[in-house]
Amino acid sequence: MGAMAPRTLLLLLAAALGPTQTRAGSHSLRYFVTAVSRPGFGEPRYMEVGYVDNTEFVRFDSDAENPRYEPRARWIEQEGPEYWERETRRAKGNEQSFRVDLRTALRYYNQSAGGSHTLQWMAGCDVESDGRLLRGYWQFAYDGCDYIALNEDLKTWTAADMAAQITRRKWEQAGAAERDRAYLEGECVEWLRRYLKNGNATLLRTDPPKAHVTHHRRPEGDVTLRCWALGFYPADITLTWQLNGEELTQEMELVETRPAGDGTFQKWASVVVPLGKEQKYTCHVEHEGLPEPLTLRWGKEEPPSSTKTNTVIIAVPVVLGAVVILGAVMAFVMKRRRNTGGKGGDYALAPGSQSSDMSLPDCKV
């Protein structure tokens, strides 16, 4: 990563650990683009990563020995050579545009050319189970903060600061929202449907969670009960703790669903309970891979000595998954701004079936 700051690495890791959230039964196509300047270490590093339903399927990395769009899932390998050549050309063109924008951002924010800066973009669409558009995304960021984003109406922009207001006005004059909306409502949805069809054995499968409860004594004398759900797909899952049939929403700690690094996901929910009262509490797990919801409780047949082993089982996949994804993704964390200038952000959306499945704005300023 060269000169990337530790803070940026932590933010990227946090983003990598957290899959995007979609409505149960829906599907998503997302692209995450990152350009990181690194003075003294050559040109900025540029990466693109594509996800279908939180599963990485394509990647481009300018630091690769032979930078090209690469398949990251077996089902995408069936695309022909023209697909990979087209996507590689587009990615290399966008790489140059993002590098120009990084330099422009320095002028907008009166920053020194000696530091490392990050420009990121995320776009994609969510569709219902019947293929209808649920929501579109088109967001830019710079150096750790939001910059500008297309609103849910896909017609207007939200600008985060004064510099972004300049961009908003230019994009409004150029009709950028209309062109972005056309992509999100058209090509994005069409390509997502195609990917779901081609990768149905992987993307439309259901892996039920393996669930168990662990027991952790606290210095205060009470106990933490933690309910684990492992190895499930898709990512949508519900974990709740109950006491006498009532959900303990306020008392419960719930982590974000996290990738395990093997194509499945993990999650846990915990609650602090009085020592000796553990069996009064039940964990409830709901997932589309289960024929019916699971109900679990801590039992005397499951001794506290097993806690360490169970914790290690989940910790190792989470860490490995984070490393794999961080190395693969440079994942999206909403950043501060996106720059346009003299040409007002010209967009290249190729029409027809041979068009790219992903269209980025021409970032020239």
From Swiss-Prot:
SUPFAM superfamilies: Immunoglobulin, MHC antigen-recognition domain. The chain crosses the membrane at residues 312-334. Keywords: Disulfide bond, Glycoprotein, Immunity, Membrane, MHC I, Phosphoprotein, Signal, Transmembrane, Transmembrane helix. InterPro entries: Ig-like_dom (IPR007110), Ig-like_dom_sf (IPR036179), Ig-like_fold (IPR013783), Ig/MHC_CS (IPR003006), Ig_C1-set (IPR003597), MHC_class-I_related (IPR050208), MHC_I-like_Ag-recog (IPR011161), MHC_I-like_Ag-recog_sf (IPR037055). Residues 25-311 are extracellular. Residues 25-114 are annotated as: Alpha-1. Residues 207-298 are annotated as: Alpha-3. One of its GO terms (biological process) is antigen processing and presentation of endogenous peptide antigen via MHC class I via ER pathway, TAP-dependent. Residues 335-365 are cytoplasmic. GO terms for cellular component: external side of plasma membrane; lumenal side of endoplasmic reticulum membrane; MHC class I protein complex; phagocytic vesicle membrane; plasma membrane. Residues 209-297 form the Ig-like C1-type domain. Involved in the presentation of foreign antigens to the immune system. This is H-2 class I histocompatibility antigen, D-D alpha chain. It comes from Mus musculus. The gene is H2-D1.
